[in-house]
Amino acid sequence: MMSTETVPPVKRVQGHKGYKNRRRLSRELALQGIYQWQVTGGNARDIGMQLQQVSFFSKADGPYFSDLLQGVLEHAADLQTQIQPHLDRQIAELSPVECSILLIGTYEMVYRPEIPCRAIINEAIELAKSYGGTDGHKYVNGVLDKLATRLRAVELQHPPARNKDSG
């Protein structure tokens, strides 16, 4: 998936006024790293170190960022295999941004069971609204909803009590 596209910079972080939470910033930074990995084929460790040098990194949840970036890249092939049946085209045909968002959401559904799937999907939708194409958030929502039905069926039948700190 090599490309000459430039890596989209993380938006809305200057000053972080009104920033929703540290995990959202961690997801945005992980998105940037996964995107960079997809379009450049760069080394995961180097990408992670580069992103940790941005001036606002201290505002993010560093361990969560590292878990997302390293986890997605380590399990990318398996995650893509889980995503593919729910797509209307080959995963290689997705935009790198939307593919990265789907990888993050799928990783969280599989490897972060303490995070409610609705929170995972909502965060992915917000990433797609900020960084994806015009209707990318609708596509991401549809794919992750289908994945949640398979990966988190019990949770969907019996949703956990709402906890604002879990997402």
Curated annotation (Swiss-Prot):
Q: Name one GO molecular function term.
A: RNA binding
Q: Does the keyword Acyltransferase apply?
A: no
- Keywords of the record: RNA-binding, Transcription, Transcription antitermination, Transcription regulation
InterPro entries of this UniProt entry? Answer: NusB-like_sf, NusB_fam, NusB_RsmB_TIM44
> Which is one Gene Ontology cellular component term of this protein?
cytosol
The answer to keyword Transcription applying to this record is yes
Pfam annotation, one family:
NusB
Instruction: Give an example GO biological process.
Output: DNA-templated transcription termination
Coiled-coil segments on the chain, per record: none
Function of the molecule: Involved in transcription antitermination. Required for transcription of ribosomal RNA (rRNA) genes. Binds specifically to the boxA antiterminator sequence of the ribosomal RNA (rrn) operons.
Q: Which family does it belong to?
A: Belongs to the NusB family.
Please state what the protein is called.
Transcription antitermination protein NusB
Which organism was this protein described from? Nitrosomonas europaea (strain ATCC 19718 / CIP 103999 / KCTC 2705 / NBRC 14298)
Q: Which gene encodes it?
A: nusB
